[in-house]
């Protein structure tokens, strides 16, 4: 009986740690996919000199991700990237992590990349930002 009690106490201490690590891993996976998509669109930008032209070539540059490129497109998971090429020089991207956090980035050819995080999102409202975000990193 004492052994069962000790195991229960150890599980009670380990479970919150495990759940926190799982959430962090889900966030990092989504962020990594978003960075890969950014690298892909920058590669396309070098060829087309336009984010609008580059967004159409994303799936051939980085085929492991799925891209939603219409203006109202929303990410529905960590491997689906919502892309909004605002104009030739600016692009917004977003991805929904499994824990409901929408990770965003906005890249401007003139001023660089900014990042954002929005909690409590769903598959219908994790959309790419149309303007620069507030943070310079996650």
Positions of predicted regions on the chain:
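Aliphatic-rich helix starts adjacent to a transmembrane/signal segment
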Residues: 17-35, 49
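Periplasmic/extracellular, small/polar-rich flexible segments of pilin-like filament-forming proteins
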Residues: 39-138
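Alpha-helical interaction segments
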Residues: 7-9, 35, 128
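N-terminal single-pass transmembrane signal-anchor helix
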Residues: 1-18
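Generic detector of short, locally flexible boundary/turn motifs and exposed helical patches
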Residues: 3, 18-19, 54-59
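Conserved alpha-helical elements of the SDR catalytic core
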Residues: 14, 21, 41
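Intrinsically disordered, low-complexity segments enriched in polar/charged residues with Gly/Pro
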Residues: 4-5, 30, 92
């Amino acid at each position: 009986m004492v052994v069962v009690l000790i195991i229960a106490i150890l599980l009670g201490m380990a479970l919150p740690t495990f759940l926190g690590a799982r959430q962090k891993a889900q966030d990092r996976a989504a962020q990594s996919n978003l960075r890969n998509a950014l690298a892909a669109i920058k590669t396309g930008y070098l060829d087309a000199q336009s984010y609008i032209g580059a967004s159409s070539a994303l799936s051939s540059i980085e085929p492991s991700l799925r891209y939603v490129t219409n203006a109202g497109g929303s990410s529905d998971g960590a491997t689906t990237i919502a892309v909004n090429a605002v104009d030739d020089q600016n692009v917004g991207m977003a991805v929904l992590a499994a824990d409901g956090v929408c990770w965003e980035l906005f890249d401007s050819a003139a001023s660089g990349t900014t990042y954002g995080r929005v909690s409590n999102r769903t598959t219908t409202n994790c959309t790419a930002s149309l303007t620069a975000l507030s943070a310079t990193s996650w």
